[in-house]
């Protein structure tokens, strides 16, 4: 009788050890255990690499000095603005007046067909700048077409940041920021030959943004 009990106890211990071994093999799937089949290692895919290409280097005095302003007085308004190379970038500053239905100011770079070559295939455009807490707008265009593409970006006062603007979120507009139904729905970065920065949306009062560069992320 005692021999039977000892045999049963030994059998139970063997079964329990086997169960623990199988459980261990299941848990440690990357370790070969006896005759158990080793699980395949899962390889996580890497995020695609990106490259930032500068399309307007406004940290260089010579390039910044080629930028000019256009404000609402062309439409009877009284807003004012100026540009200057200051603090290592293009300082675009002025005052927005709502008199005579005005309310916008802008600065733009020269026509440059090389912008499109640099920006071809871009997934986003970036504006690196020190803002003032107001919302600005990046406008890009192909000078051979009557439409442009725009996207707003809200700045953080006193902070230097790069504002990433996805290409697929640019909206086509006409000369007066009105709808442009004849324009392709999606911006083709390879067609860009001019960039501009606007402040509008009736943001009355003084403003200032210092732009270091505008880039394309490819």
What are these regions (language model features)?
Residues 2, 34-218:
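Beta-rich carbohydrate-recognition modules and glycan-binding surfaces
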Residues 20-21, 88:
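Short beta-strand/loop turn elements enriched in aromatics
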Residues 16-18:
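Intrinsically disordered, low-complexity terminal and linker regions enriched in polar/acidic
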Residues 1-14:
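N-terminal secretory signal peptides that target proteins for export/translocation
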Residues 21-32:
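Bacterial N-terminal signal peptides
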């Amino acid at each position: 009788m005692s021999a039977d009990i000892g045999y049963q106890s030994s059998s139970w211990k063997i079964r329990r050890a086997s169960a623990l071994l199988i459980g261990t093999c299941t848990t440690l799937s990357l370790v070969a255990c006896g005759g158990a089949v080793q699980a395949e290692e899962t390889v996580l895919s890497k995020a695609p690499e990106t490259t930032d290409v500068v399309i307007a280097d406004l940290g260089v005095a010579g390039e910044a000095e080629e930028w000019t302003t256009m404000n609402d007085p062309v439409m009877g308004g009284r807003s004012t603005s100026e540009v200057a190379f200051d603090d290592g970038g293009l300082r675009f500053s002025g005052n927005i007046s709502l008199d005579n239905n005005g309310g916008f100011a802008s600065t733009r770079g020269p026509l440059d067909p090389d912008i499109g070559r640099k920006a071809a295939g871009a997934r986003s455009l970036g504006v690196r700048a020190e803002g003032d807490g107001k919302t600005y707008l990046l406008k890009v265009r192909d000078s051979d077409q009557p439409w442009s593409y725009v996207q707003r970006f809200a700045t953080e006062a006193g902070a230097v940041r790069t504002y990433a603007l996805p290409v697929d979120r640019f909206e086509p507009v006409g000369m007066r920021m009105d709808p442009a139904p004849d324009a392709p729905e999606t911006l083709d970065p390879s067609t860009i030959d001019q960039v501009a920065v606007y402040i509008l949306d009736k943001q009355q009062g003084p403003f200032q943004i210092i732009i270091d560069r505008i880039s394309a992320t490819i």
